[in-house]
Amino acid sequence: MRIWSSEHVFSHPWDTVIKAAMRKYPNPMNPCVVGVDVVDRNLDSQGRLHSQRLLCTEWGLPSLVRAILGTSRTLTYIKEHSVVDPVEKKMVLCSTNISLTNLVSVDERLVYTPHPENPEQTVLTQEAIITVKGVSLSSYLEGLMASTISSNARKGWDAIEWIIQNSESTVS
């Protein structure tokens, strides 16, 4: 098992970042996400927005890794649940893969909150727990996957910035 974590500060208020995060896919920074379907979306009695989405991703696994894992599949599906609390100004997003689960599990949690010292900024904390199952070199593969998650996190931050910039340019 490998745990990866990160923190990123956006130079935008929470409302702006959350609107962009909800529209994050598709984006040109991370073309491996090839499909997003909203399965369910509802407001609870406290005004929090709950969303269930299904994401389809194209994993660019090197042929050596595919051979070690014993799979030729590159399309994977991810289940995502998010809760946006506009009163507390907090968004929590949890995701987990629902394909290749016999080989690997990736459980990710993202939390968006206003910066405690500057309300014009937003803090994103991310954590991923990666477990490769039943193969030799699992620690090595978990490290590779943590590196990929780190790279994709940066792409995600860039995508949110790109969405914000493009939204602002279309409004002005």
Swiss-Prot record:
The keyword Mitochondrion applies. InterPro entries: PRELI/MSF1_dom, Slowmo/Ups. It is found in: Mitochondrion. Its main location: mitochondrion. Pfam families: PRELI (PF04707). Interacts with triap1. This is PRELI domain containing protein 3A. It comes from Xenopus laevis (African clawed frog). The lineage of its organism: Eukaryota, Metazoa, Chordata, Craniata, Vertebrata.
